[in-house]
Structure formats: C-alpha cells, structure tokens
Amino acid sequence: MKILYSLRRFYHVETLFNGTFVLAGRDQETTGFAWWAGNARLINLSGKLLGAHVAHAGLIVFWAGAMNLFEVAHFVPEKPMYEQGLILLPHLATLGWGVGPGGEVLDTFPYFVSGVLHLISSAVLGFGGIYHALLGPETLEESFPFFGYVWKDRNKMTTILGIHLILLGLGAFLLVLKALYFGGVYDTWAPGGGDVRKITNLTLSPSVIFGYLLKSPFGGEGWIVSVDDLEDIIGGHVWLGFICVFGGIWHILTKPFAWARRAFVWSGEAYLSYSLAALSVFGFIACCFVWFNNTAYSSEFYGPTGPEASQAQAFTFLVRDQRLGANVGSAQGPTGLGKYLMRSPTGEVIFGGETMRFWDLRAPWLEPLRGPNGLDLSRLKKDIQPWQERRSAEYMTHAPLGSLNSVGGVATEINAVNYVSPRSWLSTSHFVLGFFPFVGHLWHAGRARAAAAGFEKGIDRDLEPVLYMNPLN
C-alpha cells in the first residue's frame, strides 16, 4: 500500500477497520479518506460532489413532503395545532393557507397540495442526485466550464457566493409577494383575535428595520426577536431581498480585494467551516425566535410562549376572582405586594404574583387592556371580552414546558394537558442545530487553517500519553 502520509504523524488520523474496502471505485489509498468520510472523497470531483449535494437536497425535500402529508393525515380540526405535535402545518398556516379568523383551520387541501409538490420535487432532485453521483461526469470543468470550479479560484468562489445570495434574495421576495398580493399572511394582531390579511403599509424606514439590529438582546429589548408587527417583518424581507440580490450581483461582478484574499483561507474545507458557522448562527437565532416571538410564530398555531402562558394564568384568575367580588386593584398578596396587580420597575401597572418576571410580555389578547401606564384598571373591570378569557384559559393550560414523556404545562397547574409544545420541540432542536454546527465549524476551521499554514493535521503520535502507559493485562 502506498503511504500517503508520514507514519510518524498519521496524517489523516483515520484508523481503518477494513483498509482495502472499495466504494464507487474509490478507496482510502487513492483518496486519503476512508469510506465513512463521505463527501471528503469527492473534494476534487466536482461532478460527483454535485450528485451528493443534489441527492441531499432531495432527501431534505422528501422529508418535508412526507412529514407534511403525515401531519395532514393525522390532523384533527377540532383541536389546536399545538396540541397535536405539528411543526409543519403551523408554518403553512402562518403563511395564510387554509385558515380564517382566530386561526381556525377551514381547509386542509392547501396543506395536501404542499406535501405532494414537495414529494414530486424530491423525486426530481433524487433522480438528479443519483444521475450525477453514478452516471454523470466525474468532474464538470471539462464539459461544463460554467459549472466547474477549483477551490483555490477565488474569483469563481465569490461568483458562486453571488449566485447563492441572489437565490436567497428571491426567496425573501417570495414571502413579500405572498403577503402583499397573493392572499396575505396570518396576523395574530388582527382585531378580535387574529385573521389572514394582506399587508398594505410596509415598514421600509431604515431606522426602524436596522434599529432592531442595534437593540440589546436582553430583557425587554430582545434584538430582532422583539419584532411584533407584520409590517416590520415583511418590510424587513424587502430590505433583505434587495441586500441579498445586490450583494449577489456585486460578488458576481467583482474579484475579492487584497485584504479579503489575505484574511480568508481559500479551500474546500475552509468554505465548509464558514458555512457551518453561518448555519450555527441561524440555528441559535431560530431557537430564540420560536421560543419568545408570538408574531412570526403565532400562538394560535405554535401554542403560547412561556411568558405568555404565565401571564395568561394571572389574567385568568384575575377574571375569576373579580367576578367573585375581589377588588383586584387593591388586594394584597402574601408578600405584601399586589395580589393581582402591581407596578413594574418603570412604573407601569403589571400583573402581580410570580408572573411579575414576565411583565414585558406583549400578546394580542392582552394589549387591548393596556393604557398609557400599563394595564388599565377601568378596562380590566369593564372591557374584558369573552374571546380574551377563552384564549388566556387555553394558553394557561398549555405552557411550553415538559419533556417527551412528561405531562406538559406548568407543574402546579391542575388543568394542564398532556402534551409537548411545538415551541419546545422547535427551540430545543434548533439550539442543538446551532451548537453542533458550531463545533463542526471549529473542527473544520482548525483543519483548514492547519492545512493552509502547512503543518500537518492530527496529533503527534510520539507524544501520545498512551505510548508510555503499562499494558492493561
């Protein structure tokens, strides 16, 4: 066997169970990678790598279609989506398909269509992936120079980056078009408890849109996660669309400047590490967004946020005890603070009790009861609507707490329902999808930088502690 690495250093650090194993005409001897290193064997085979990526896209779209149809088949219209463990139908409902006032599902056919379209798309992608992985040219450079590339070719790499940015920008514009012209989107803030509406008055002011980026991520500020009206969300997508499209055109037309050529490592593994870092950032932002935001992720579909369920409980008992004759404005709790109402650090009137920590929650069922100084006592006495009572009682019993095999909801709430909130699912999964790509980013960045600097990857076996330990037997 030809040795591709110094035996002293064990360059690739893979110890093979079966060093002679050949897969798709490639083995460790010719590629330097074992069979399980997957696409690493295809680093310099652009045609085969294209096949791997297209097939991967096919798997992703197949999951989306199959899971979509699975959720449609199991969907019960009489129960809220969040009580049924659904994670895809809420996204479709948020886009305004199949739902009406209050988030009630009127028609599941659009959901069925979505699932079938994704399945058909996945078949096309799957065929393309298999074709390019097994039958197509190993490398694209000779036959299709436009699609060919060399990892070190900085100009080609930024051109590919530009094409990706343009596609992302067009994706942002698709949401804008849906919201403005094609039926609108679901707005949880629509009067009377939410409805589908077209967005007419876009927020395009740069001070508002980019103001979100300058906010603190903590407390009531909440960075971009604090966005609470659809005009800002859709206006933000207009900005994103233009930035991505013009940035893409810029990257296609220009070559990297000298400072960029010096600052970056220009290799396949380096690009992988950059991509993983970006995915990691997306994962962490998505985690916070789905956990805290009830505008982009309407509580009608995803269930209440944690703070929302807590405030709903305080509101429900305020309503009950007020009916029983309690004076909610002056009743004292066991700590000497107000039992139902108290003041926040900045002087607003807020709910008392343990939920005081969530005083800066904003929710569509609660905001109509606020005045210029927080909760308005006269509105609490005279203006509470039946839909607000119903919704808060529902949210109170569906807190996004609990684990796979537990009773969901607040542990002390006797009416809680056995369920796990989609917010719990989506935020925990996206935290994991933020954390592990970050570890992968560090790993691949380290390898890429080591390779670029010219020293060998892996551990020097001469200094490995195990060499100096007594045998176990």
From Swiss-Prot:
Gene Ontology CC terms, in alphabetical order: chloroplast thylakoid membrane; photosystem II
Which function does this protein serve? One of the components of the core complex of photosystem II (PSII). It binds chlorophyll and helps catalyze the primary light-induced photochemical processes of PSII. PSII is a light-driven water:plastoquinone oxidoreductase, using light energy to abstract electrons from H(2)O, generating O(2) and a proton gradient subsequently used for ATP formation.
Descriptive protein name: Photosystem II CP43 reaction center protein
Query: Do you know which InterPro entries this protein is assigned to?
Result: PS_antenna-like, PS_II_antenna-like_sf, PSII_PsbC, PSII_PsbC_sf
What does the record say about how the cofactor binds?
Binds multiple chlorophylls and provides some of the ligands for the Ca-4Mn-5O cluster of the oxygen-evolving complex. It may also provide a ligand for a Cl- that is required for oxygen evolution. PSII binds additional chlorophylls, carotenoids and specific lipids.
Q: Does the keyword Kinase apply?
A: no
Residues that the record marks as modified (N-acetylthreonine) are: T15
Positions contributing to [CaMn4O5] cluster binding: E367
Write out the transmembrane intervals: 69-93, 134-155, 178-200, 255-275, 291-312, 447-471
Modification comment: Phosphorylated on threonine residue(s); phosphorylation increases with increasing light levels.
Q: Per the similarity annotation, which family is this?
A: Belongs to the PsbB/PsbC family. PsbC subfamily.
Coiled-coil segments on the chain, per record? none
Example of a GO biological process term: photosynthetic electron transport in photosystem II
Q: Which UniProt keywords apply?
A: Acetylation, Chlorophyll, Chloroplast, Chromophore, Manganese, Membrane, Metal-binding, Phosphoprotein, Photosynthesis, Photosystem II, Plastid, Thylakoid, Transmembrane, Transmembrane helix
Provide the assembly information: PSII is composed of 1 copy each of membrane proteins PsbA, PsbB, PsbC, PsbD, PsbE, PsbF, PsbH, PsbI, PsbJ, PsbK, PsbL, PsbM, PsbT, PsbX, PsbY, PsbZ, Psb30/Ycf12, at least 3 peripheral proteins of the oxygen-evolving complex and a large number of cofactors. It forms dimeric complexes.
Q: Output the superkingdom of the source species.
A: Eukaryota
- Is Metal-binding set as a keyword in this record? yes
Q: How does it sit in the membrane?
A: Multi-pass membrane protein
Q: Where in the cell is it found?
A: Plastid, Chloroplast thylakoid membrane
Phosphothreonine modification, residue list? T15
